[in-house]
Amino acid sequence: TNRTGFNFGARFSAANDVYHRVTYGISTSKITNRSTSATSITGENGKSLLKSAVSYTIGKDTRDNYFDPTEGFFTEISETFSGVGGDVNFLRSNLRGGYYKPYLFKSLVLGVKGRVGHISGLGDDVTQSERFFLGGRDVRGFDSNGVGPRDKGSGGAVGGNNIYSGTVEVVSNLGVTKDAGLRWTVFSDFGSVWATDFPSGVTKPDDQAMRSSLGLGILWNTVIGPLSFYWATPTAEQSHDNTKTFQFSIGTRM
């Protein structure tokens, strides 16, 4: 998908670590590199669509560090309404949260996080560029967008209207020199994405089967930010999924 546009908004802090955020965005999107069957799958028919949307988020965050939390929790609910003019009309709902608990004087941290999401068309079907996609950092061991329904013609991911994912992870510096800035992690990821308004030509569009993986990682705090190296293997997958053993990222680890 080729997408251009901009967003602007404001965040307001309240008592007890609660925050509110309001955002407005306008953008145009167009599906490119489609297979013969993908025109009916995307719902966009090669057109450039204008989206005008407003979002509201409320959350609570008590984590001690946004990039590298060792204790605390966060929870966030967001609603996005698209239909303030434009060609795209939908309501998207997201709920996400996480919890972090230190042990052994913070030398070992247990982290649990998860998210669920749903998008509904308002008088229109949900097009591909607005659906949820899963894989990569969300479910390590799978390629980016590697989980879920796929175009039978091109094999490309087409996304879904429903999503959930979660992670259980242990991070520790036990056995590592403190000044090195290195830690190790073991983790399990899981999730699924499914349901499209254009099921023709799609592989298993309504398959809700959970995918999962197990893996190991190395986390390194550097002057340019946290670096993460992950090795993971799927423990539950579908034949049409795309897997990926090694992944690298810069920034937040969970």
Regions found by a protein language model. Give the residues of each.
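Structural signature of outer-membrane beta-barrel domains
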Residues: 17, 25-33, 63, 82-84, ...
